[in-house]
Amino acid sequence: MAVNLTEKTAEQLPDIDGIALYTAQAGVKKPGHTDLTLIAVAAGSTVGAVFTTNRFCAAPVHIAKSHLFDEDGVRALVINTGNANAGTGAQGRIDALAVCAAAARQIGCKPNQVLPFSTGVILEPLPADKIIAALPKMQPAFWNEAARAIMTTDTVPKAASREGKVGDKHTVRATGIAKGSGMIHPNMATMLGFIATDAKVSQPVLQLMTQEIADETFNTITVDGDTSTNDSFVIIATGKNSQSEIDNIADPRYAQLKELLCSLALELAQAIVRDGEGATKFITVRVENAKTRDEARQAAYAVARSPLVKTAFFASDPNLGRLLAAIGYAGVADLDTDLVEMYLDDILVAEHGGRAASYTEAQGQAVMSKAEITVRIKLHRGQAAATVYTCDLSHGYVSINADYRS
């Protein structure tokens, strides 16, 4: 049950010049499901990417990392669902390379110009033969179809677009898709995200921008505290809008383009939380007046990933001592609890180390019954702030994950 999230139509997701999309049914996920996607990238495009921090990262992550900075440039991304190709050892890498070679033959490039991505069950061999057999059968697709093809336990395809001025003369377009519903936690999580723009950006600058955007968007979400083996976020810049290249972060267009792409990426990241496994509520946790952003994030994550907090939200139960407890164990050094203020939406709940005199249980109940809730925490020890996004923890989460392989 997604929280205020609906599927985008093809008309809402404009094509990006220099990008071609293809999908097919490879039979990796389940019979009758479209589970293979190819994103063909025009020659001369640049690509930035960031990947999971999980030490058991999947075979395609290893291969994509090694191909990303190849001097020949990236010409294609190939994505399968239904199998993560993680925990598959040397054979997993052989299989990922075989898929790259087959995709390269299909579009006429070198295997090292293909980035592979997989998502699905871990510790199962990749049926590379099925993927290779399906590649010649791929059909042209729209962005909304590609968004559906990369889903696993998602209930709604996730896609978004932006258009805006970058520089004085040029309008930039960007469209992106993402997947993810469970095993979601900062530092990328099983989440895949792909954004394409017609802006022209040098590879080193695009790589830095990709890292910054990931940190400000996908690394601010948590569903269940688990970090996947396959997380990947990619930005493709085709350079087809005739603007001159952005090759320096001091270029004013860098900040303009980053703001546009950050807005798109944040919509995709929030969509993952809204479609969190079993989610019935979307929760924003904002910590203000911290000494540093890291400290603010530390406190926000403690609240956002607490099972006790998340189940209280599911039950619409204003058992708000759970939130105070999470702030207390967040590890904020020398925290003066007498200075902390906590709000549910605009309702002051706690101050001076205890319950606010003005707060009533009825007020808390009214807020906790909403589908979207904001928790605001003021530490009163500095000027830094951070926001993270999470969802509640329901019976549905347990059922989805208990039945995942059945």
Curated annotation (Swiss-Prot):
Organism, scientific name: Neisseria meningitidis serogroup B (strain ATCC BAA-335 / MC58)
Keyword Acyltransferase: yes
Broad class of where this protein is predominantly found: cytoplasm
Keyword annotations: Acyltransferase, Amino-acid biosynthesis, Arginine biosynthesis, Autocatalytic cleavage, Cytoplasm, Multifunctional enzyme, Transferase
Catalytic site: T190 (nucleophile)
Functional summary from the UniProt entry: Catalyzes two activities which are involved in the cyclic version of arginine biosynthesis: the synthesis of N-acetylglutamate from glutamate and acetyl-CoA as the acetyl donor, and of ornithine by transacetylation between N(2)-acetylornithine and glutamate.
EC numbers on record: 2.3.1.35, 2.3.1.1
Site feature (Involved in the stabilization of negative charge on the oxyanion by the formation of the oxyanion hole) residues: T119, G120
Homology family: Belongs to the ArgJ family.
Domain of life of the organism encoding this protein: Bacteria
Full protein name: Arginine biosynthesis bifunctional protein ArgJ
Family annotation (InterPro entries): Arg_biosynth_ArgJ (IPR002813), ArgJ-like_dom_sf (IPR016117), ArgJ_beta_C (IPR042195)
Site (Cleavage): A189, T190
SUPFAM superfamilies linked to this entry: DmpA/ArgJ-like
GO CC annotations on file: cytoplasm
Signal peptide: none
Broad EC category: transferase
Gene: argJ
